[in-house]
Every structure is written in structure tokens, then in C-alpha cells.
Amino acid sequence: RELGRSIYCAEDSTVFLVDHLGVQKDKKFKNFSRSPKNNLTTTITDELKLFTNQRSKVIGVSLKDRGAIFPSGHLANAAYWYNPNNGHFVTSSYYMNKLPQWLIKFNNKKKSDSLLNQTWKTLLPIEKYIHSEIDDSSFEKKFKGKQLSIFPYDLKTLRKENGNYKLITHVPQGNTLLTELVKATIKGENLGRNETTDFLTISYSSTDYVGHNFGIRSKEL
């Protein structure tokens, strides 16, 4: 109401994108100015930090910024989310001014590229999926460059016309990428290595995107 406009749930103009080059204050990165500032209550992770007098380490990860930020709360040590412009995971200056070395190394492995060279296909023969609708439904969203919404999906062919690195958020490989980040986070941050409870929040986003694009009874979901 004070601004006279709608606001994004995690927007915060006082903080900036932090990537492998450090703090990015250029206005072209304003969509990465994110924090939990707009959350008006505490979270379970905040209460854990208070209970342990900040000894607990709390980190949130997700493809979506809001999926990483809000579950990990106001007092999180870090929240990392996906940058669809280059396939890297980033954060904001709310948490830090430079990425940890383990995350820079993870980004440099370009796992999103290798996953986007794959083909999205069913695990079982498609006729085994008897509790979903037909594969080619008129209600399903089509990827650009593909005439029908049917398996298989050649991601290497589709990525150029469908947002390049952004495509991975709309296919199961996005969940695979996040799982790889989860494993790297546990190791890189030494989570769970002492008597104090740590908390890693994980929000898988690709399932949500696939549901929106194809429907809850689709073969894809």
C-alpha cells in the first residue's frame, strides 16, 4: 500500500545478487535482490537458531528463490537458489558478500549443462502408467519446437527455444540438479558434524512447474 504497487514476496531493494564475482549492484540484477524481510513471523529454523544461541547452522536450497529463503527463515546462515541465466546457484547480500568456495566449485562443474543434454523419458513403458490421462492432451502446455506434448523430450534440442538454462526448472532434471546441490551443501558446510542440531531446508520446484505445465493427471507428472 505504501509503494502503491504489488510486491514480490521475497523482494528486498536493500540487498543485492551475490554470484561467483561477488556482490552485483547493477540494476539489471534487481530480480535477484531477495531476502526474508517480508515474512512477518519466525520460522521453525529461526526458533532453532534462538534456542541454540545461533550455534545451529541453517541453510536453505531450492531452484526458486522463495523456496530457499522462507523455509530457512530470517536467521539462516545462507540460502541458495538457481540463476536461470547461467545455470549457477546464487544468493544475496542479505546472507554474505561472496559465495563459499565449495559452491563456486560446484557451479564450475556445469552440472546443469550435462543434465540438459539428457532426454526426458518415462522410467517404465508408457502403457504401465494407467492412473494418468493420455500422453497427448489438448490441455497440456507445449514446449517450443515440439509439436506434441508427448514423450520423449530431447532436452538438448529443446533448450535453445525454451529459455536455455531455465528449461531445467520445468523438467525432472531440475530435481536431480538440486539433489546434487544438497549433497554438496552437506559436505561443503560440514552439516551435522557436532552435537548441535543443524537444519537444511530443501524445496523441490520442478514438480510444481511440471504440474502447472501438464496437469496433475498427466503422464509427465
Where are these predicted regions, by residue range?
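His/Asp/Glu-rich, glycine-adjacent segments
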Residues: E2-T196, S205-H212
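Polar, low-complexity loop segments and adjacent catalytic/binding residues used for recognizing
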Residues: I202
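Active-site-proximal segments of metal-dependent phosphoesterases and phosphodiesterases across multiple
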Residues: I216-L221
